[in-house]
Amino acid sequence: MSATRAKKVKMATKSCPECDQQVPVACKSCPCGYIFISRKLLNAKHPEKAPSSTENKHEAKRRRTERVRREKINSTVNKDLENRKRSRSNSHSDHIRRGRGRPKSASAKKHEEEREKQEKEIDIYANLSDEKAFVFSVALAEINRKIINQRLIL
């Protein structure tokens, strides 16, 4: 049955201008010898002579423009701005940097706190009068005596 039923497939064809024969569109030449010129070849520009020397090759490549550098104007305003920028950058470096992530050890933190306390420690009793100092020393002596007596009992 399949032999009797032949499928007719309609192909896209083009006719040869010399022999008027129908040739498939994909063919670039006709059996009679005629060569079909593709539209790409018609529209394409013919390449000029290829540069033979290395200098011409470098010229053929696209040139990149150089970066434009601004000239600095020597004025007091610009100097002031530069000084401000420098002072700001220095002030940021003075701050204590907090490290990100897990702390390495707790002892390092304690050492930092002790240093800060020593730096911030101010003598409160410097402006204290002699009478007040005597009253406080008597009170401290009584407190110390009571604590020592408690230790002896235990």
Curated annotation (Swiss-Prot):
The modification Phosphoserine is found at residue 91. The keyword Ribosomal protein does not apply. Pfam families: UPF0547 (PF10571). It comes from the Eukaryota. Residues 104-132 form a coiled coil. Residues 68-84, 109-119 have a biased composition (Basic and acidic residues). Keywords: Coiled coil, Phosphoprotein. The keyword Ubl conjugation does not apply. Belongs to the UPF0547 family. This is UPF0547 protein C16orf87 homolog. It comes from Bos taurus (Bovine).
